[in-house]
Amino acid sequence: AYARLVGVPVAELDDVVFARYPLAVRINNDYYARSIQRVNDDLSLSFYCAVENGIVLTAMHTVSILDELDQTLSDIEQRLGPAWVTLGCDCCLRRQEIEADGTVDQASALLRRHSVVGFNTYGEQFNGMHINQTMTGVAIGRRQRSRR
């Protein structure tokens, strides 16, 4: 069913396809990615995080990962002032997507421009839930004090 949904033959389902066509679970008004790990021999799917039997998953569409990241970091800098440093924890599945898109150099330049340092993770915990395909971080700004 997933292969038909995304228009890709089962034999061609791989990490790149899984990253480009994620599934998500809806909780209240928010969607949380449920990243596919592999296609099993019986054609069922295994996920990187818990997916209970009977849970409804929604097909999601991705946007430009770099455009979205640049906008988010710019918004944070608008609120905090220029970032001194941001410690970023980026899901390894995002890294795979960037590599597949051939945009590693552009991603590195964007992260340097916004003073981001960090590492790749295997997802994050949020409110007790394991989520994937996300970037979390701590931004430390350097807002100037006003003189009195």
Where are these regions (language model features)?
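Small-residue-enriched flexible segments
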Residues: 1-114, 121-148
